[in-house]
Amino acid sequence: MSNLEHITLEMDKVPLGDNKTLVRNTENISKHSYGGAIDGRTRNTLRVPRAVPETDDDDNDDRPFVKDGNDNPGVDDGLFSTVGGNGGNGGNVNVNVPNGGRRPSFSFPGYNGPGFVTINGVETPIPDVNAYQHKKTLAQGMMDLALLSANANQLRYVLETSSQHPYFYPSLLFISLSIIFQIAVGVGLILNGQYNIKNGHDICRANRINNYTVSGIFIVTVVNVLISAFTVDRDTVPALPANTT
């Protein structure tokens, strides 16, 4: 018996559980026979990629379908139009594309006339923008025009004072200017309330008159500050010299 045969017989007598190298080699060989791969350097089993059937992600898609007869899924259907203004995949979804591809603009609620809106189950009429804007402008203007009564009282007080007072004429001038500008502002507010802001020409005129009224209110405010600074007081009227002749 040769030495090689003797070594082979001795190795056959060794249990497999005591020789870890032999066990590992046996496992690698068995795995390789079933499709595994063995790294030549580390003798470890490599994972061999296998072709698996692809799953369609759209099978369990819970997005709504466009009701155009073709069951086009997704929320993007109809956003991009093809020839004829229809959505993708040959659907019959009509897409209204404005000029230049811009998003269509919607008017303010109530701008095109009075309508109705449901609030807590109750139909509430929407006020007309014209009437609302006019009432708001008139209310703001009338709050400023309330100063007219105070100026009228101040004018009466100055006229009852002697003209010898040093602030008599400045006070008379400022009070008169305040009253005149307040009357002009009131006329402008009344004219501004007559225009229809739905009309392009009327809204330009109303805007111009509104600018004039704002300027007039500013002038009235400045003039009344000057009136407060140059107040006429009867106690400070200089006494007339007595006639000694």
From Swiss-Prot:
Record family assignment: Belongs to the ninjurin family.
Residue intervals annotated with topology Cytoplasmic: 192-211
Region (Helix alpha2): 149-165
Xref: InterPro entries: Ninjurin
Protein name, entry field: Ninjurin-A
A cellular-component GO term for this protein: extracellular region
Annotated source species: Drosophila melanogaster (Fruit fly)
Residue span of region Helix alpha1: 135-146
Disruption phenotype: No visible phenotype; flies are viable and fertile with no obvious developmental abnormalities.
